[in-house]
């Protein structure tokens, strides 16, 4: 049986990951405003945002299986979402370079009155970089729409020195976690 769902995200990375495991989907970007409340633990923040996105789309498609997801980076108890612009991306990378940090991704699946949420954390260490290297990476534009200002699946892979945990989680959607959640809705990838 082919798994089919609505993706409450415009993220090209999440689309690529779903395609990679053979999930059929339709993109229905959510109008939900992501919250970046520093008082919330990151595990709670990402699942709340993921659920908010899925529930927002459910208003337009109440009988569908809907996937919402949210990713943040945490370093020294500070939450890093997407940068506000090139200067912010450079600042984030300057703080993260040479350091271990944690990437949290929350997943929400919603179908009619049922919903399930879960999160996954992955530790990542970026290599040490010179200010010129950071500026060149930012100038290429890749980090401008990524939590933490780097794309592990793109040129940013050259910035990653080590990873401890789920690679696809850092990209923006833990595939092993998603497969487990889909099974709870009687949808099997394999």
Swiss-Prot record:
Its cofactor is a divalent metal cation. Coiled coil: none annotated. GO terms for molecular function: dTTP diphosphatase activity; nucleoside triphosphate diphosphatase activity; UTP diphosphatase activity. GO terms for cellular component: cytoplasm. It comes from the Bacteria. It is found in: Cytoplasm. Belongs to the Maf family. YhdE subfamily. The keyword Transmembrane helix does not apply. Keywords: Cytoplasm, Hydrolase, Nucleotide metabolism. Its main location: cytoplasm. The keyword Kinase does not apply. Nucleoside triphosphate pyrophosphatase that hydrolyzes dTTP and UTP. May have a dual role in cell division arrest and in preventing the incorporation of modified nucleotides into cellular nucleic acids. The active site is at 70 (proton acceptor). GO terms for biological process: nucleotide metabolic process. It catalyses: dTTP + H2O = dTMP + diphosphate + H(+); UTP + H2O = UMP + diphosphate + H(+). NCBIfam families: maf. Its EC number is 3.6.1.9. The record marks 13, 71, 153 as: Important for substrate specificity. This is dTTP/UTP pyrophosphatase.
